[in-house]
């Protein structure tokens, strides 16, 4: 059964619907003065080739053809929609199609107007509106009947005095408790420096008692991880772009310790990524005082020393808002933002101090940043994120998306896990961690920024039933 994705664009023109087929085999995109003049698709229906109608009108500006290999399929479409000239309704001004094997109809470039994405599985049909131009485009998406990484989302009941509405904060789990630190309600205005603790047995929040070197700044864009019974938090900034250093919090004694002052550790930053294994805490990327960062640093909790990992190379771009997870001894960097969203995937091998870029395939999520992520066995699970920056940067909401995807780090294949229902709403700038609730391991996600620029206060868990 195929899922119909709502057409993106204007509401002018004749409605057309090509229907659902086994696969899309060829795409024709006609260029016009202001954008896309027409589209036409060819489909496979069993052994039969079905040639669809032209939607819009040809011009003398040429037609681009994109042929899909017989063992491949389209997994997402990116485009831009905009009111142009004296039009009263939006038209489609740019389209790019990408397949499961990474083949792209044309490079995806930033354009004026509003970016949109059609994604979530194997695309098996299209629909939309057109006059003498293409006004809107939607798709039909087919999903595998049962994902290899089977699970489901639950909304966790919350009681007590919790973090409330916020985004750009950090969470981590120790035993049967989830901790939350930092964040904002109003853009660029940190809320507090309380350490909130959620008891999974009572489903109740409280504020943890704090002694010792309590972080001196209330901060946003902070990250936090746990190793054993200890929390580690690094960076984050206040409203004047002053930064926090590197701290630990002993959950058995409720004591903060300043491990590395801000001027002595890795480059001060916010909106970076953190991960940990049994002996090391990793800090990657983020936004410094002058520019984004692409370095990876590790802190050995036994030796209490920092190690500056090798440079990932010139082809690896600076970025913030990336996914960072440790899987089977390797440190994985997934996607992020370098001025625009990117979709490259790399891993770092601590044993060899070496970087490797990998090519992933399958039902691949489109470029995004500031998404939720977790490591579950050999998989990296992600949810949501931002697909296009707001013109007002962090002050605005940006274009946010939903969708739960998993990357198998052994086969390098992506799959979509949810099926467009029972899923948290679109969001980004969430706090997330790998966690265990009611005996299941999965992705824990709290809060985040909504497409309306409001903040969420909900707590969700994607629990894995089988791997």
Swiss-Prot record:
Tissue-by-tissue expression: Mainly expressed in roots, and, at low levels, in seedlings and leaves. Observed in seeds.
Binding annotation for a (Z)-N-(sulfonatooxy)alkanimidothioate: 237, 270, 292, 321, 370, 429
Name of the protein in question: Thiohydroximate-O-sulfate sulfur/sulfate-lyase (nitrile-forming) NSP3
EC id: 4.8.1.5
PROSITE patterns the record matches: JACALIN_LECTIN
Domain Jacalin-type lectin: 2-143
Keyword Lyase included in the entry's annotation: yes
Record-listed Fe(2+) binding positions: 386, 390, 394
CDD domains from the UniProt entry: Jacalin (cd09612)
GO biological process, one term: nitrile biosynthetic process
Alphabetical UniProt keywords: Iron, Kelch repeat, Lectin, Lyase, Metal-binding, Repeat
InterPro entries the record matches: Jacalin-like_lectin_dom, Jacalin-like_lectin_dom_plant, Jacalin-like_lectin_dom_sf, Kelch-typ_b-propeller, NSP1/2/3
Additional comment: The proton donor differs depending on substrates.
Organism: Arabidopsis thaliana
Cofactor list: Fe(2+)
Active site per UniProt: 237, 292
Disulfide bridges in this chain: none
Origin organism lineage: Eukaryota, Viridiplantae, Streptophyta, Embryophyta, Tracheophyta
Family according to the record: Belongs to the jacalin lectin family.
